Amino acid sequence: RDCLLSRGLGDVYKRQKEHCTKVYAIQQVMERYSPHEYDMIVVFNSDNRVVPNALHLLNNAYYSGCDSIQAHRMTENLTTSTAVLAAAGEEINNNIFRKGHTKLGFSSALLGSGMAFDFEMFHRISPTLEGSDLAKAVEIKLLEENIYTEYMQEIICYSKKQDSAQGYSRERQRWLSAQYNSTFLALRRLPLAFLQGKWDYCNKLFQWLLPSRFLLIACITIAAVIFTILDWTLSFKWYILLLLIIITFLMALPEGEINKRFKHAVWALPILIFASIFSHFGRIFRSTKKNK
């Protein structure tokens, strides 16, 4: 019945704190309300657009028993090759880590926007959220309490992607900052989660240990080239692994406008791969410089 919409939280609270994060902003919002004041909370970014019946569909899912819901986020600005490749990457993630996971009985991965939660439950966990990445902070709390996240592909949430290599690199830097923290968290908690039989939790922690798509492709390609030079008989498995990964990603790419434009934008893929690699080195360099 009653739903609290939260949009552009960082813009609202950025003046109250020098380095405002979504986690801080959402905590400030939730402090204003009592646990039973609303039925649901729906979180969007300030630039998001949704289909007209989005709230109706979310309401139906909520009253069907879903306490945590992730909508289908799609890229709106397919204006450059970089934006098209970023959009293709997000659709691959949607099919593997959201649609694919729910088909296997695991929770959908959260995205940080286009999310809906039971208000009382979210009010309870919001003070305990930590870190700068809202999606990862919420995911870890939900999985600790065995709360399942449903993925609703029919609820389209349009967002804007970086349309230049420089913008993509800056976005990767922010993602890496949260990813490194998640990796160390996964290394600490995965053994205990495995012994406790929390398979949904284990699946998420293992996922956080994996490198990004572009870095994975780059590492396997470099390994294949090195072994080809040193001993070509040892390189076959690397080429087979590279082929299998590429086929997997292509199978996860849906039909539609993104698929059509991807064929013409694939030439920019090496640029994004190098941008991803440089983002990692940039992160390491800044950490080393800061420690000095």
Indicate where each model-derived feature is located.
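Catalytic donor-sugar/metal-binding loop of nucleotide-sugar-dependent glycosyltransferases
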Residues: E139-Y158
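Long helical/loop segments within the catalytic core of UDP-sugar-dependent glycosyltransferases
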Residues: R15, H19-Y38, N53, L57-G131, ...
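Nucleotide-sugar-dependent glycosyltransferase catalytic core
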Residues: K161-S177, R261-F262
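Short beta-strand-to-loop acidic/aromatic patch adjacent to the donor-nucleotide binding site
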Residues: H36-R49
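Acidic donor-binding loop at a coil-to-helix junction in glycosyltransferase catalytic cores
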Residues: G131-V138
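Catalytic core of nucleotide-sugar-dependent glycosyltransferases
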Residues: E91-N95, S169-L190, C219, A275-R283
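Single conserved hydrophobic/aromatic residue that forms the stacking wall/gate
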Residues: D2-Y13
